Swiss-Prot record:
HAMAP family recorded: RimP
Presence of keyword Cytoplasm: yes
Role summary: Required for maturation of 30S ribosomal subunits.
Main location: cytoplasm
Gene Ontology terms: biological process: ribosomal small subunit assembly; translation
Pfam families registered for this protein in UniProt: DUF150_C, RimP_N
NCBIfam families from the UniProt entry: PRK00092.2-1
GO cellular component: a single term: cytosol
Cellular location(s): Cytoplasm
Gene3D superfamilies reported for this sequence: Ribosome maturation factor RimP, C-terminal domain, RimP-like superfamily, N-terminal
Source organism (scientific name): Bordetella avium (strain 197N)
Name of the featured protein: Ribosome maturation factor RimP
InterPro entries for this protein: Ribosome_maturation_RimP, RimP_C, RimP_C_sf, RimP_N, RimP_N_sf
Gene name as annotated: rimP
């Protein structure tokens, strides 16, 4: 799958589109998830679908259906660049090891800093108890999974 990811990423180079994920699903479905700084439009999905159809045909990639879409409002965060990009946003993280009996934290992602051992350290500002704001420091190695967790109003717009 790593080769397919690299091939897809190379095919999208220069389009201003970030490749988030490539997934093989049941019944020959190949699901490609893309993102852009200002959000994915339907035209982006169409353009990527046409581009990848040609590339996959030339490279003999076996699939029956190609699905191109956005990661959605609760997109996963997987690497340092994504964490840096979404600093200031509300996220949910699940830690590999519990801190104060908790593994799951939701709060505002803070800018990265570098620790004494040159690891990138992020902060998560969260409400431990009512009106008790704390900051959890973590590295990417500490995280099992992370995703955006925006608060949406009843009209579906991010607040």
């Amino acid at each position: 799958m790593a080769d397919l990811f690299a091939l897809t990423e190379e095919a999208l180079a220069g389009m201003g589109i970030e490749l988030v994920d490539v997934e093989r699903a049941a019944l020959g479905l190949l699901r490609v998830t893309i993102d852009r700084e200002d959000g994915v439009r339907i035209e982006d999905c169409e353009q990527v679908s046409r581009q990848l159809s040609r590339v996959y045909e030339v490279e003999n990639i076996d699939y029956k259906r190609l699905e191109v879409g956005s990661p959605g409002v609760d997109r996963p965060l997987r690497n340092e660049a994504e964490f840096r990009r979404f600093a200031g946003e509300r996220i949910e993280i699940k830690l590999r090891e519990a801190v104060d009996g908790r593994k799951v934290f939701t709060g505002i992602l803070q800018e990265a800093d570098t620790s004494a051992d040159d690891k990138t350290v992020f902060g998560l500002e969260f409400e431990a108890k009512k009106d008790d704001i704390q900051v959890l420091s973590f590295t990417l190695d500490d995280i099992e999974r992370a995703k955006l967790d925006p608060v949406l109003d009843f009209k579906g717009k991010k607040r």
